[in-house]
């Protein structure tokens, strides 16, 4: 048995560890802390410890388990919440309370729970590695397939059915003169990639339902994508804006000052912005559908803005907001979101009014949704403090302003997990702040799978490894997550793995490397950073699996990077971009303009576009690629023309260039912009995306023809068909085709009036 001779944070040096091998798991000290051998010199072993080493002393024992760091694989993984080394956090909470006691190592899978095993083979059949022996209904959404472990083949001499625990023997296989007992549970070393028969080219897209991703920057099943980390959630209202709480009205600026002084709250500070995560949520009111309901806010945002818009209404209501902040405007029978700078006199905006009803004994006061007409709008320039409340679970709005106006708030989350057509989602919170992980752990279990109505957790595994946990466990969490993903891929499922954030993992590598006194590379990161990042992303892919039957599965890896100050030239971002083929560039400026998803179409890219072209042409339309290229061309041209417009002014520009700016605005606002909280707009099928894009390009074509015939953009900008196009995003899937046909007919008719009778007839 070895003994400790040196301790440096999470790094421990021991000597005379019995039978020491690289990456063996050891138990360190009297408390039996879990560690892993990462370096051997003579009789000295260097160990990275996955738990806090405070209080450990030299000469304490080190015991070698003689096995590598492994995960348990079997029924019960789904719906679980693990830490970085697959310890179930719900079990630990029962044992040690809110904090993880050191030395605890409960089993990852419940040993007592019984699962209904349904055999898929019979006694006497010959089986091979990867073959499915039987199935277990793990959750309402996922059937768990029990496979023959690697290295085992032969005749089935016993196969069980009925209810069994994960450690029970459910089959016996005889081959090569040996008899093998097979349990429902198996283990696998996390650093070793699971074998596949062959990798396949990325030819099928991971459909997310998000138009900016599916249409412009698609990711393939089995592909890799990089996303920069979180940023400011956007600016909203001035500090003197009243917010309606359950205890009455309070100025949002006062609420922020009280919150930032409360030591129980967590404060995050960025450049010209602060977010206070509230220990005690604010009880407020929000608009959900056509009702005003009680809601809660878990955070307050403070930032700066160089302009404020004051909006006043007929009945004396008033609010001061940033120009890009959206108000809810009534158009016909529907309510749409419109930036305050674009709200006009005469528009009716959503408000709340107090309704009292009852008899002389009891009076019940309720809030009801109403609309008030705008009578004036003023723009003020200068530097203003602005604030926002985060209300993620109640339509992202709150009631405030002088006179109870519905105020918008939007932060998009969980869309890929909720809407992508992956069967399994593995989310790794690697080194994120505890409050952020808490928000995910509390909101994820409440989300519903939109296709089945079942809880999203029924197909999800969460791995939580917060920033105050030992840094060594961050690296382990990445490997734990990808190994679990590979296991479900081997069953034939499509898995989406989200690692948030790989930058925190790289920081852990840097700290361990520093403790080992290794030669630092760029910015202090170890020289092998690029290799480690590549090893992780290389475990993604779509593959023909090891099995006698033809079975396919995929792992799509989406890694978030959190570069300091948003500088993607730093080593972690550059090494990530080198091995990933999709980059979704999140843009704080777009978020501030309330454009969500805030993926910048000029800075983002996808290298899968050509690989997926034939799939889109075959399964959606042969015009798909041409429409996409034209949309990208218009958006690129818009960025060039905006500089010209700023120099010479919009009115001095040629009509054709005005048209490009106009169509680009339609693409941005009516196609790329998408509401995560609108029941219809949250998910957009590929067919609907195609018809929306085609309708926009139809306007582009006919607008150019009308301009050639002498029309001006002033004539065309007020056509009624343009408003009908902007409403297409909220048309239900079942009605979208007939809506599109009517829309195109109206485009031909209204623009035909400007083209001239001859041209109109020719084009029709």
Swiss-Prot record:
Gene name tied to this protein: atpA
Topology term for the membrane: Peripheral membrane protein
Taxonomic path: Archaea, Methanobacteriati, Thermoplasmatota, Thermoplasmata, Thermoplasmatales
GO CC, alphabetical: plasma membrane
Protein name: A-type ATP synthase subunit A
Catalytic reactions of this protein: ATP + H2O + 4 H(+)(in) = ADP + phosphate + 5 H(+)(out)
One biological process term in Gene Ontology: proton motive force-driven plasma membrane ATP synthesis
Primary role: Component of the A-type ATP synthase that produces ATP from ADP in the presence of a proton gradient across the membrane. The A chain is the catalytic subunit.
Modification note: This protein undergoes a protein self splicing that involves a post-translational excision of the VDE intervening region (intein) followed by peptide ligation.
The keyword tRNA-binding belongs to this UniProt entry's keyword annotation: no
Top class in the EC scheme: translocase
Note: The intein interrupts the ATP-binding site.
Cell location: Cell membrane
Oligomeric and partner information: Has multiple subunits with at least A(3), B(3), C, D, E, F, H, I and proteolipid K(x).
Gene source species: Thermoplasma acidophilum (strain ATCC 25905 / DSM 1728 / JCM 9062 / NBRC 15155 / AMRC-C165)
């Amino acid at each position: 048995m070895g003994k400790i001779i040196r301790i440096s944070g999470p790094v421990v040096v021991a000597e005379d560890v019995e039978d020491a091998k690289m990456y063996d798991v050891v138990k360190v000290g009297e408390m039996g802390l879990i560690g892993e051998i990462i370096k051997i010199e003579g009789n000295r072993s260097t160990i990275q410890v996955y738990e806090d080493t405070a209080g450990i002393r030299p000469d304490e024992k080190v015991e070698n388990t003689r096995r590598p760091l492994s995960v348990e694989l079997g029924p019960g993984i789904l719906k679980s919440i693990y830490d970085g080394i697959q310890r179930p956090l719900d079990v630990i909470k029962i044992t040690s309370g809110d904090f993880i006691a050191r030395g605890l190592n409960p089993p990852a899978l419940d040993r007592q729970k019984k699962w209904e095993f349904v055999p898929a083979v019979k006694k006497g059949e010959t089986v091979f590695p990867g073959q499915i022996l039987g199935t277990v209904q793990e959750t309402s959404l996922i059937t768990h397939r029990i496979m023959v472990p690697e290295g085992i083949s032969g005749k089935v001499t016993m196969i069980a059915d009925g209810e069994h625990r994960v450690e029970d023997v459910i089959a016996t296989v005889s081959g090569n003169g040996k008899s093998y007992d097979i349990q429902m549970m198996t283990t696998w070393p996390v650093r070793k990639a699971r074998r596949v028969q062959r990798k396949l080219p990325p030819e099928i897209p991971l459909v997310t339902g998000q138009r900016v991703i599916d249409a412009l920057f698609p990711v393939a099943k089995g592909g890799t994508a990089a996303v920069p980390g979180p940023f400011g959630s956007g600016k909203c209202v001035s500090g003197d804006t009243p917010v309606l709480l359950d205890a009455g009205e309070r100025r949002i600026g006062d609420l922020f000052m009280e919150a930032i002084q409360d030591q129980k709250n967590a404060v995050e500070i960025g450049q010209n912005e602060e977010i206070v995560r509230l220990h005690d949520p604010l009880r407020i009111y929000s608009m959900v559908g056509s009702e005003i309901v009680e809601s809660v806010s878990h955070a307050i945002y403070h930032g700066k803005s160089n302009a404020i818009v004051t909006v006043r209404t007929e009945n004396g209501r008033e609010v001061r907001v940033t120009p890009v902040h959206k108000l809810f405007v009534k158009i016909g029978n529907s309510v749409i979101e419109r930036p305050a700078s674009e709200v006009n006199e005469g528009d009716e905006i959503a408000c709340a009014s107090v309704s009292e009803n009852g008899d002389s004994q009891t009076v019940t006061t309720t809030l009801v949704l109403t609309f008030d007409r705008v009578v004036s709008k003023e723009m003020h320039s200068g530097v203003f403090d602005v604030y926002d409340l985060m209300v993620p679970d109640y339509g992202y709005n709150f009631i405030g302003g002088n006179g109870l106006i519905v105020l918008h708030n939007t932060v998009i989350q969980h869309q890929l997990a909720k809407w992508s057509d992956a069967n399994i989602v593995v989310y790794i919170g690697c080194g994120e702040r505890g409050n952020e992980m808490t928000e995910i752990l509390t909101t994820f279990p409440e989300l519903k799978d939109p296709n089945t109505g079942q809880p999203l957790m029924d197909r999800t595994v969460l791995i939580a490894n917060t920033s105050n946990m030992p840094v060594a466990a961050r690296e382990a969490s990445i490997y734990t997550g990808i190994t679990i993903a590979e296991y479900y891929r081997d069953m034939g499922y499509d898995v989406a793995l989200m690692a948030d954030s790989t930058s925190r993992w790289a920081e852990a590598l840097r700290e361990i490397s520093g403790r080992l006194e290794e030669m630092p590379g760029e910015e202090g990161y170890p020289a092998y950073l690029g290799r480690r990042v590549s090893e992780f992303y290389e475990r993604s892919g779509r593959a023909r699996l090891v099995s006698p039957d033809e079975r396919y599965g995929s792992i799509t890896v989406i890694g978030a990077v959190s570069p300091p100050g948003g500088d993607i030239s730093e080593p972690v971002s550059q090494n990530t971009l080198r091995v990933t083929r999709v980059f979704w560039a999140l843009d704080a400026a777009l978020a501030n303009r309330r454009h969500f998803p805030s993926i910048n179409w000029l800075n983002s890219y996808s290298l899968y576009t050509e690989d997926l072209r034939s799939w889109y042409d075959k399964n959606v339309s042969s015009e798909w690629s041409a429409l996409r290229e034209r949309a990208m061309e218009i958006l690129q041209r818009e960025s060039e023309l905006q500089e010209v417009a700023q120099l010479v002014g919009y009115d001095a520009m040629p009509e054709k260039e005005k048209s490009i700016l106009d169509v680009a605005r339609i693409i941005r606002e009516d196609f790329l912009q998408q509401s995560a909280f609108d029941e219809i707009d949250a998910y957009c099928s590929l067919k609907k995306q195609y018809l929306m894009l085609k309708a926009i390009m139809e306007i582009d074509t006919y607008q150019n023809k009308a301009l050639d015939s002498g029309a001006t953009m002033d004539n065309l900008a007020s056509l009624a068909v343009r408003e009908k196009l902007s409403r297409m995003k909220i048309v239900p899937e079942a009605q979208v085709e007939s809506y599109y046909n009517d829309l195109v007919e109206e485009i031909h008719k209204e623009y035909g009036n400007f083209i001239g009778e001859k041209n109109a007839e020719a084009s029709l």
